[in-house]
């Protein structure tokens, strides 16, 4: 399988591979910073231009999964969020291997920021883990927007 590897990421397993062998979930990894760098590369137009970039942006804005994660605290604001979720299986200890959300936020004043929250081996419920991501999203939004 062809993949992407760097000092801050190692991604070479497909979703199907990870469902068949849970150990593969731990072989695919990145940092939140590296995930945001990749997203910025895509959204800024450096990776794709014109219709291709617009397609990526609109696909992420229309994402319906994980509305209880990064988008949750933004629902009452005029910010626009595009995001993509990732949810892993439970390991042998009953932990959720990975609950993730990465996205970009357009503020009403025209500024934009990107955010990635990656939760590994959560012992919480799916709802409580989503709430952790939402809480981080809210804190970042309040800081960046100045709504403290």
PLM regions and their residue ranges:
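Single conserved hydrophobic/aromatic residue that forms the stacking wall/gate
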Residues: 1-8, 12
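Alpha-helical hydrophobic/aromatic positions enriched in membrane-embedded helices and signal peptides
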Residues: 1, 23-25, 78
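Flexible, solvent-exposed loop/hinge segments and secondary-structure transition points
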Residues: 15-23, 29
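Structured C-terminal helix/loop/strand segments within mature extracytoplasmic catalytic/sensor domains
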Residues: 27, 31-148
């Amino acid at each position: 399988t062809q993949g992407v590897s760097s000092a801050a990421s190692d991604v070479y397993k497909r979703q199907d591979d990870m469902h068949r062998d849970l150990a593969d979930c731990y072989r695919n990894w990145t940092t939140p910073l590296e995930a945001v760098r990749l997203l910025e590369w895509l959204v800024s137009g450096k990776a794709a231009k014109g219709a291709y970039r617009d397609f990526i942006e609109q696909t992420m804005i229309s994402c319906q999964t994980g509305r209880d994660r990064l988008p949750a605290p933004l629902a009452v604001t005029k910010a626009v969020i595009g995001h993509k979720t990732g949810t892993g299986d439970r390991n042998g200890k009953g932990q959720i291997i990975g609950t993730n959300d990465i996205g970009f936020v357009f503020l009403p004043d025209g500024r934009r920021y990107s955010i990635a929250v990656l939760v590994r081996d959560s012992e919480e419920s799916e709802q409580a883990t989503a709430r952790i991501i939402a809480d981080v999203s809210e804190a970042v939004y309040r800081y960046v927007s100045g709504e403290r």
